[in-house]
Swiss-Prot record:
GO MF annotation list: DNA-binding transcription factor activity
Span list, region Leucine repeat I (LRI): 211-270
Compartments, as annotated in UniProt: Nucleus
Species per Swiss-Prot/TrEMBL record: Arabidopsis thaliana (Mouse-ear cress)
Region (Leucine repeat II (LRII)): 371-403
Record protein name field: Scarecrow-like protein 4
UniProt keyword Methyltransferase, yes or no: no
Motif mapping: LXXLL motif: 420-424
Record region (SAW): 506-584
Stretches for region PFYRE: 412-503
Coiled-coil regions listed in the entry: none
Amino acid sequence: MAYMCTDSGNLMAIAQQVIKQKQQQEQQQQQHHQDHQIFGINPLSLNPWPNTSLGFGLSGSAFPDPFQVTGGGDSNDPGFPFPNLDHHHATTTGGGFRLSDFGGGTGGGEFESDEWMETLISGGDSVADGPDCDTWHDNPDYVIYGPDPFDTYPSRLSVQPSDLNRVIDTSSPLPPPTLWPPSSPLSIPPLTHESPTKEDPETNDSEDDDFDLEPPLLKAIYDCARISDSDPNEASKTLLQIRESVSELGDPTERVAFYFTEALSNRLSPNSPATSSSSSSTEDLILSYKTLNDACPYSKFAHLTANQAILEATEKSNKIHIVDFGIVQGIQWPALLQALATRTSGKPTQIRVSGIPAPSLGESPEPSLIATGNRLRDFAKVLDLNFDFIPILTPIHLLNGSSFRVDPDEVLAVNFMLQLYKLLDETPTIVDTALRLAKSLNPRVVTLGEYEVSLNRVGFANRVKNALQFYSAVFESLEPNLGRDSEERVRVERELFGRRISGLIGPEKTGIHRERMEEKEQWRVLMENAGFESVKLSNYAVSQAKILLWNYNYSNLYSIVESKPGFISLAWNDLPLLTLSSWR
């Protein structure tokens, strides 16, 4: 369903249309359920291609949204608080994205991200198995919180094979890495050896003795972290006492305390055996992401908002080139392709995606990039789009302007979706190099998505404090749709968040990458130092993000928060967790 209006006074008509469609969806779901009962159909037998005429990746009625709004309401329902729909973008770009493009609708011919994941489930062993292709660790496409692996959905582990085996074809040889001579000289702005940031907030390694985090259980963990280096014996004794009050099956506070206690214990006793599993199957990881994606709006918010910025920046362009830093499975792009295929100004004559593999793909990313390119090409073919996917196999630290083919008549977009934080270190040199490379390509728009928490330029105790606040909100946000007795929730928390918590406060070992994240203010400094200026997201993009929360009937504790110069954050209980921005 398209949320678009030709004049700002039509919001009530939109609301009426929404209510009417939802009533129709309820009737369809009831009939669908009756059919299952009559014919003995197993609703958990997943068939990604319910309507063969639609091709793969296009949703039919067999995939109703598990969290769609129920109940009706009259036409005077005041609960549609989106007065800022941007008339320009609604009429020029075709209204942006349909919420169904992100799994919120059941109409035929629309991209369903869950189907995309389910196709990976059926054919995942052809893409991402093996020790050299750890696709799901630190995966920006499949993980909204911590790109660590997760494990869930026992009832769906037995899935039927699908036609994805013909889509993911790793038998075709990978073309050798191509170095394209740039159409015009591309020079990367030189790195300066002076202070890498302007207005750089001062790093404060002193610990906050007045930390007042509630409840007391989390304060006790923070106090333990403060003395973990100076008095490890006392810290260990304190952890033993804390263990009596924590549980991975308790309330959100008890659960987050459980994982922090485990991580601190491992830090104090690095030779002790790990208490959680060290590996998960590819299928489990995909299913776990699906659980998180169904229950929480993080992935949908990030992709929807970034794609809208790209759609608006390229609204009249015939040739579009997207450079994606850190692509894995490409889940972000089908919805954008569908929006481009249906825009009112007509289809682009050419769309190209240059995919730079995420570090999580390991030293041999070729099979995953081939599979991603095949899926996207076949999806674009269904939409009758002239599409090409170019794998960029050069390591990110060796990339330069000649690594990309940039035609002079192309409009270029650069996408950093939950990727740059992986390049953070004690100094911002690597991040600065990547940003200056992006700037040298002269993009029309750069989209940046990052987690909203400071875990980099702070001392250990403050890192624990910030992480406690962040993950307390994350664990609470799972509760509305993943209940206290949910096995799926336990596995997502253990395999995803537990691993990430361990990575940010666990043992300091050589060769282990420390989890580092930064808040939006530091990203602003880094972007501006590289020569970018902020582009405020349109009123339509902001309203669309709010509609996303409303459409899926997520908890009212989720909110969209705007901040200067052009940031938009998804928050839980007023605490920003994930921030998107647009630059040029």
